[in-house]
Amino acid sequence: MKALEGKVAIVTGAGRGIGRAIALAFAAEGAAVALAARSRAELAEVAGEIRTAGGGRALAIPTDVTNDGAVEALVEQTASDFRRVDILVTAAGTAAFASLVDSKPADWDTMLSVNLRAAMVCCRAVLPTMLRQAEGTIVNVASIAAKRALPGSAVYTATKAGLFGFSRVLAEELRNSGVRVGVLLPGAVDTPLWDTLAGSPPRDKMLRPEDVARAAMLMVTLPPHAVLDELTLLPAGGIL
């Protein structure tokens, strides 16, 4: 039997990068996966890969995670089509790197909305279903930036540190409910995020999205009596 046979997962940011890798990995292990991202075309491509590979069922739901109503609709459609929600992975994220003096308040708002607030809204939206089931696992994808001082990333770091703190508190609030909450803290991952950034670390030294997917898989496949409430994953080459 596959590790996630019979499980239903919602993955945000599933169109590319880390979210895509996690969705593909979960489907390969038998999960039914609700794929959420803004791009309908990217979601269709990922859903097609899942079906071609013969993995679990895939439901592509174009979603703007900064829209509370869209998030509620995502959860409602997933629960309606698959009858339950066992796993939530919040992998949607964005970044704009600059010194605080050179940064733009509009970028602050975008990062706070996508990286922090949207993840909080997603968690709140799935909790009624998970609490009724008395089981579920939430994995919030933060960043090593939540724990390291990286020049040029003050606002990005604030959003990821906020997500880290939120996840730890939520884990305590739900400790005896059957719902587990973990936060995943990857270092530099080779994703399209770096395509437009000058001075990035060598791409071949970074983590791969599939590495992060393996870590997420570990977090959601532990037996019910165990929880990885915090997992840091770094490149072995000494870069962040």
Residue positions per predicted region:
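Conserved glycine-rich cofactor-binding loop
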Residues: 8, 15-16
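Conserved glycine-rich Rossmann-like NAD(P)H-binding loop of the short-chain dehydrogenase/reductase
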Residues: 29-45
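Substrate-binding pocket helix/loop in short-chain dehydrogenase/reductase
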Residues: 99-100, 107-112
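Active-site helix of classical SDR
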Residues: 123, 159
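Alpha-helical segment proximal to the catalytic Tyr-Lys
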Residues: 128, 172-173
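Residue(s) in the substrate-gating loop at a strand-loop-helix junction
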Residues: 143
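C-terminal helical subdomain
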Residues: 176-179, 183-184, 191, 201-240
